[in-house]
């Protein structure tokens, strides 16, 4: 089974701290979710989805997190992912069109904003680790390429390899 996360929304800089999608409560205790989610990796192929929306039916809004089961009528995957080098992830935009979560599929309901709720904290913590690992890998590879490049290039002025230039060595040391 493939589990996807539909958290990010267009133009929503609150991310996990508040949704612009709607979570409409149903009489049976479940919710219907409406709105757009972006960068939903493997949305075309997922069996289950963790997502959230805002329930504004009470005195104070609540962020409602739930397991959702995609279907053709209420879960539309847009064919809009075309980022060079990342095509395989298929991180398309998804339109939630009343996708239903029964009461037992509701993971948590929390006030919008920073939270130590285990669901919110768990998603946030793992995302930050994955994001940091990605940028660490990019930086490490850039440093490796820089080191290799200065060994093979030479100064026109004195034919010395750039690896012997004190300013270039200083910049590489700073990057490390």
Question: Whereabouts are the PLM-identified features?
Answer:
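Glycine-rich beta->alpha junctions and the first turn(s) of the following alpha-helix
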Residues: 83-176
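A short core secondary-structure module
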Residues: 39-77
